Amino acid sequence: MKTFTATPETVTRDWFVVDADGKTLGRIATEIATRLRGKHKPEYTPHVDTGDYIIVVNAEKVTVTGNKAKGKTYYSHSGFPGGIKQISFEKLQAQKPEMIIEKAVKGMLPKGPLGRAMFRKLKVYAGAEHNHTAQQPQVLDI
């Protein structure tokens, strides 16, 4: 029997909605990254994007354990000398709560064109509302 290899034409993608209210950041991010890659499907193929679409709501209510809310720092650099910027978890959660989940999931995906295609299937919203009701997403309980 030949080994099955998925092709982009044969892949079926579902839409799932995840509620991040009260969930731990790392635990929710690993499950989202696995679903975006498609590793939960039997037809998973490493060089083909077989993952599903994931909608995350209530990103502002995601939690971290221990003292990470005060101690966790996110860095970015402009590329110019002295252009490093840092922001704590608490401040980032107040300013751009979507970025916390996006950054955690992006680090768990492959680097390169395939990883960027997988990351584009992630939709994160700070509040409880999203504008993807036409896709009829299923609730994914993590």
From Swiss-Prot:
Q: Which CDD domains match?
A: Ribosomal_L13
**Which InterPro entries has this protein been placed in?**
Ribosomal_uL13 (IPR005822), Ribosomal_uL13_bac-type (IPR005823), Ribosomal_uL13_CS (IPR023563), Ribosomal_uL13_sf (IPR036899)
Keywords, alphabetical:
Ribonucleoprotein, Ribosomal protein
Gene Ontology CC entries for this record: cytosolic large ribosomal subunit
Q: By its UniProt entry, which Pfam families does this protein fall under?
A: Ribosomal_L13
Q: Which family does it belong to?
A: Belongs to the universal ribosomal protein uL13 family.
Question: What HAMAP family does the database record attribute to this sequence?
Answer: Ribosomal_uL13
Task: Write out the function statement from the record.
Answer: This protein is one of the early assembly proteins of the 50S ribosomal subunit, although it is not seen to bind rRNA by itself. It is important during the early stages of 50S assembly.
**Stated name of the protein:** Large ribosomal subunit protein uL13
Organism of this sequence: Shewanella baltica (strain OS155 / ATCC BAA-1091)
